[in-house]
């Protein structure tokens, strides 16, 4: 149950629209998109207009798009990515690509943010800095964060509660 709604019985493609933001262990970015476009992908999920209104560029569509750009810029700035807004993600270092992936998930304005190995391949200091920024923004939008991570030092530095699993059992 998420925000008072049973989501487990929804079709899988609708569950993603139910207040969950997520990243994957392996980056799932589009190399042909720039950093801003990735943030806008997340925001696009929340826009509430139909294809006809979009086709005719109705005033409320233009307002929502302008607001989406503002929110995207705010989020990119918070995650120290604003200076890279027009860079293709394939041209960025791995650590910045991880941040772009997280930005796209945060841009969905989730109730719960699921992060699968967000620190994989990053030095602990860089991962900790990124996760502190994620936690700040999650607090700003009142989102819970669930981290699946093997880096115990990172988890201890950013978590309110830690649950350890071994062979599928809580220990």
Language model features with spans:
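Glycine-rich phosphate-binding loops of nucleotide-dependent enzymes
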Residues: 1-171
């Amino acid at each position: 149950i998420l925000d008072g709604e049973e989501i487990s019985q929804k079709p899988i493609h609708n569950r993603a629209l139910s207040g969950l933001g997520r990243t994957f262990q392996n980056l799932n970015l589009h190399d042909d998109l720039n950093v801003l476009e990735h943030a806008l992908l997340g925001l696009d999920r929340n826009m509430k207009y139909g294809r006809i209104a979009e086709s005719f560029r109705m005033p409320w569509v233009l307002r929502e798009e302008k607001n989406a750009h503002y929110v995207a810029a705010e989020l990119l700035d918070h995650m120290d990515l604003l200076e890279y807004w027009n860079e293709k993600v394939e041209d960025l270092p791995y650590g910045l690509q991880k941040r772009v992936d997280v930005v796209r998930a945060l841009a969905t304005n989730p109730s719960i943010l699921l992060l699968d190995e967000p620190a994989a391949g990053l030095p602990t200091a860089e991962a900790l800095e990124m996760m502190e920024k994620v936690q700040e923004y999650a607090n700003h939008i009142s989102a819970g964060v669930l981290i699946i991570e093997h880096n115990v030092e990172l988890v201890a530095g950013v978590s309110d509660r830690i649950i350890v699993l071994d062979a599928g059992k809580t220990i």
